[in-house]
Amino acid sequence: MDRAPAEQNVKLSAEVEPFVPQKKNLDAFVLPMALPSDNGSVSGVEPTPIPSYLITCYPFVQENQSNRQFPLYNNDIRWQQPSPSPTGPYLAYPIISAQPPVSTEYTYYQLMPAPCAQVMGFYHPFPTPYSSTFQAANTVNAISTECTERPNQLGQAFPLSSHRSRNGNRGPVVPKPQLLQQHIKNKRPQVKNVATQKETSATGPDSRSKIVLLVDASQQTDFPSDIANKSLSESTATMLWKAKGRRRRASHPAVESSSEQGASEADIDSDSGYCSPKHNNQSAPGALRDPASGTMNRLESSGCSGGVNWPKVTCQATQKRPWMEKNQAFSRGGRQTEQRNNLQVGFRCRGHSTSSERRQNLQKRQDNKHLNSTQSHRSDPNSESLYFEDEDGFQELSENGNSKDENIQQKLSSKVLDDLPENSPINIVQTPIPITTSVPKRAKSQKKKALAAALATAQEYSEISKKSCRKLYQKQLEKTKTPVQLDLGDMLAALEKQQQAMKARQITNTRPLAHPVVTTATFHTKDSNRKTLAKSQPCVTSFNSLDITSSKAKKGKEKEIAKLKRPTALKKVILKEREEKKGRLIVEHSVLGAEEPTETHLDLTNDLPQETVSQEDAGLSMPSDASLSPASQNSPYCMTPVSQGSPASSGIGSPMASSTITKIHSKRFREYCNQVLSKEIDECVTLLLQELVSFQERIYQKDPVRAKARRRLVMGLREVTKHMKLNKIKCVIISPNCEKIQSKGGLDEALYNVIAMAREQEIPFVFALGRKALGRCVNKLVPVSVVGIFNYFGAESLFNRLVELTEEARKAYKDMVAATEQEQAEEALRSVKTVPHHMGHSRNPSAASAISFCSVISEPISEVNEKEYETNWRSMVETSDGLEPSEMEKAAPCTHSPPEKPSRLALDTSLVGKQLPLAAGSITSAPSQGKPTGDKDELKPDDLEWASQQSTETGSLDGSCRDLLNSSITSTTSTLVPGMLEEEEDEEEEEEDYSHEPTAEEVQLNSRIESWVSETQRTMETLQLGKALPGSEEDSAEQSGEEAAEVPEGLESGADSETWTPDQPPKPSSNMGKEHPDSSSPPQST
């Protein structure tokens, strides 16, 4: 035909006659089309059988069309075939009201709107290039008019761009002035059309006549001007026709490539279904249908973004689709779809297309240009080019938005992921996703495994806690409010969770890694992810991609908000003790601050040194309690209640052992460890566990049920303990840095129970790695305290090596402990020698003072020098003024007994002063600081002198009469709680400080006592102890405590018999009694 009227401002190829359908039936989605004959006349209503290759390539035609003749695959007529010879393009034209005939060269069958993909135009191979210009614009107008007239059979307006995409629904095209059409056409030349027939653009920088031999016979210029003038929103039917874009989808890449490469359509066979240059040029008319802002925008952007005119897309889709499907497994739901969408989107007026679609089109085109160009050239003219699938070719028609989303995802996966580093979590997660990217299933499974390992490693080293993950995720949500981003994060989170644990049930563990992905691949997940995941990972795709609120893929009956786990009994104990420790620290600091200034009180002073000692030795923050037994106070584990399995209850409570343990062990090397830690053991354990985990995982991949029945490992104290009771564990690996929880039912008890069971069952138990490292070895993100090995078959060499290393480490540990104990014993001896007499009484380590705390407290008294005991006894007698009345009463009868007894009693009293701290556990003495004042009056200096003389005469301190005087002496000044040996030691110190005053006042005492007092004064001056009274009291209390433990009752009677004579001043003794009557017992400088 001749050029269209100028009014149309559209140059159409005169060679192509508009295709006229046999009859126009609005009800039918696709009607048999009358194809223009070569002479330009529309062939009669009689349908011409379509070549079988066309039918084969396009099997998916709606069968529900009543009007339509269904061609059999054996050359039956599916659409009316144009009379022209195959040389002319075979074009199925959308049923549009007859328009000015288009040259037969361009017979174009446009898709009829149908729920399923409508019949696509098939193009017969047309060897001759299209020389004629585009059909007159009026033809286009007529076509568009018919399209407009044609109701949307589908009831959905399919945007031009969405023909292929399942998102095809678009608003009806709004008619726009033909000027727009003109303008669009002018710009059309700017947009490189894949197939450009000899076209003359009315206006435009690119206006030039191109002769492109596009085998595609579809001519979009055949649309009626009405349609061309209408915008996408107005002409919904046109949009439906534009569904032809599906064909174009396949050809679209070719269109882009050929247009950009400048390849003429002559290069493409007509069979391939490429659009003729007319169609490319007339895609503008198709766009003109959108012509308003839509078409103009699209055409304008078509050069950059779409560039693919609607007819062009159709032709290209037809041609490229087949080979692309072959070449790319994912083309159906993947990039081809994207290309098709891009073409269609571009074909759809840019104004109508969403900004995201335009961007997607641009990106898709950029990504696909190379593919399209190569594919368009590679595409064969045979039926492959015409191969279509309903799902693939018409995804957009069937599912709106699916193909577009898929296209977006494909684009992102190809473009975004390619830019990312290979080891990035996003890349790792995405690699298994594009199943449609022609990746074999085997490769996919391998990638999944590799992904799981990579994710596990990445997250294990990152050690992101769930809280931090949630915070990260919330931040991501705040920053990226787009639902797609949320969906993507959730998808990736689910993927990571599943693969990181290498088990679908562990999806929740790897969620954090999804967050970095959220921002990078925003559009990634809607449909294509959903589809690909549905194939590979059905559990991940259970969520609704349209639901913005669904933050993560759900598995089974998993709750959106995970219900907090109730803490187990062990966890409750751990949490409780943690709180107690915090409280103790606070109380300790406050108590220490209060006690240091108030050392005058015997109780406080007694507690303080023990607190410091126990804290130093045990490393615990718990102050020693006066009510505790000496063993508990001496032990480094003076926490109440002490667990049965704790070291305190397992014989580690001796001072030497406790100091050794505290010196060797630390938080990272707890006391329950009985072997030395070494890198060799750690490496061996790591290899062994990783090997066993790999065995278990391999079995799990093959047969999950069997894998569960034949587990290799078990993690956790609870599980390990349970299986050890069942005698199923072959080896136990314990982390040496478990938290110290010594309360009953706490962590220490659980660990000692495990060790005890292992010893009973003769199971090797190894201390290696830290809790976090142990967790990593078994592919866990959380710390693991204990790992039990059910079966090490297959890794016997590693296991045997581990056992050998462990035995060597135990030997090394024993040697280390022995060496440390020896060193400490030597240090204790040196410290005892250097201790001042008033502090250590110049005796063996049995002085039990706070300084010599680690010495053997229970040293027999027989080893002590007699002189020391005599002097101590005398000093105690001096302080006996402060004896309680009851004690004095008890001591009196003893003293009245024959002289042998009194002498022994006196000696015993002196011994008691020294023994008191040692034996104080047996004595319960009430604070007698106030009482001694009254008691001292009862005691008389004569009796004391007599007792002292007896003691000097006898001179033997065998302790036979310790009973009587011991209790009285101890009770006088020491308020020691029974069993408080350390308190007695403290008393000794205070007695030393205190003793010099009372001794100065006492004049009539024995010469030895006087000498002792002078010596004590000198020592006090040298030490410059401001608190002399308390120190002396401590010493006397120690001595009295020693004897009091042995003879608690005898002291009081002896005290009664011995009463002070009025000649002697009672005050000094009373003062001594008040403050620390035991001052007499403290160390003798002699």
Curated annotation (Swiss-Prot):
Stretches with biased composition (Polar residues): 193-206, 294-303, 328-344, 624-657, 922-931, 947-957, 1004-1022
Biased composition regions of type Acidic residues, renumbered to the chain: 981-994, 1032-1046
Residue stretches of biased makeup (Basic and acidic residues): 355-370, 933-943
Modified residues (Phosphoserine): S276
Pfam families noted in UniProt: Ribosomal_L7Ae (PF01248)
Function of the protein: Binds SECIS (Sec insertion sequence) elements present on selenocysteine (Sec) protein mRNAs, but does not promote Sec incorporation into selenoproteins.
Protein name: Selenocysteine insertion sequence-binding protein 2-like
